[in-house]
Amino acid sequence: MAHGPRYRVPFRRRREGKTNYRKRLKLLKSGKPRLVVRKSLNHHIAQIIVYDPKGDRTLVSAHTRELIRDFGWKGHCGNTPSAYLLGLLIGYKAKKAGIEEAILDIGLHPPVRGSSVFAVLKGAVDAGLNVPHSPEIFPEDYRIRGEHIAEYARMLKEQDEEKFRRQFGGYLEKGLDPEKLPEHFDEVKARIIEKFESEGARE
């Protein structure tokens, strides 16, 4: 381990690969709530967080598990379509809570164009949340709807049905033909929009 008068031990969360403090400081200086997006292999989570000297406060949050529980999502929760739907959900939740704008915080996730973290952003923006962005970073619409997944499933089924059933077993167990994923995406998206727009009309 390095040592000497000029050596500084990095903060613990930086050592653990959890926080980029330089980037965090820039986000805090904006003074806006942060749209915090995090992902794992099987799920995405989105939160609207504001800085507080005593500790960050979460104003609203959404998890891809809610897509399954509340809106009947049958697809995988770690893919691009589910990420977009999560963004739509957090965007509507934020608007309902009176939050009009935020700044994106993807933590240590690499800012890769078209990645699922930017699908979350796209969904939030489509819900009406004002987040500074460049449209070029969004995934293509066909990827947001899961058309690439449906096409791959179709090809795999024709070439190797056993492998198809292994890879898409989770879809099939829930009664979803992966070739119908784009249509299923449209149905779940419509349910999210209907829920929040009908609630807004009643208010």
From Swiss-Prot:
An MF annotation (GO) of this entry: structural constituent of ribosome
GO biological process, one term: ribosomal large subunit assembly
Keywords: Ribonucleoprotein, Ribosomal protein, RNA-binding, rRNA-binding
InterPro entries given in the database record: Rbsml_uL18_euk
GO cellular component, one term: cytosolic large ribosomal subunit
Pfam family, one: Ribosomal_L5e
NCBIfam families: PRK08569.1
Recorded family membership: Belongs to the universal ribosomal protein uL18 family.
Job of this protein: This is one of the proteins that bind and probably mediate the attachment of the 5S RNA into the large ribosomal subunit, where it forms part of the central protuberance.
Classification via PANTHER family: LARGE RIBOSOMAL SUBUNIT PROTEIN UL18, RIBOSOMAL PROTEIN L5-RELATED
Subunit structure and binding partners: Part of the 50S ribosomal subunit. Contacts the 5S and 23S rRNAs.
HAMAP family with a match to the protein in the record: Ribosomal_uL18_A
Protein name: Large ribosomal subunit protein uL18
Source organism of this protein record: Pyrococcus abyssi (strain GE5 / Orsay)
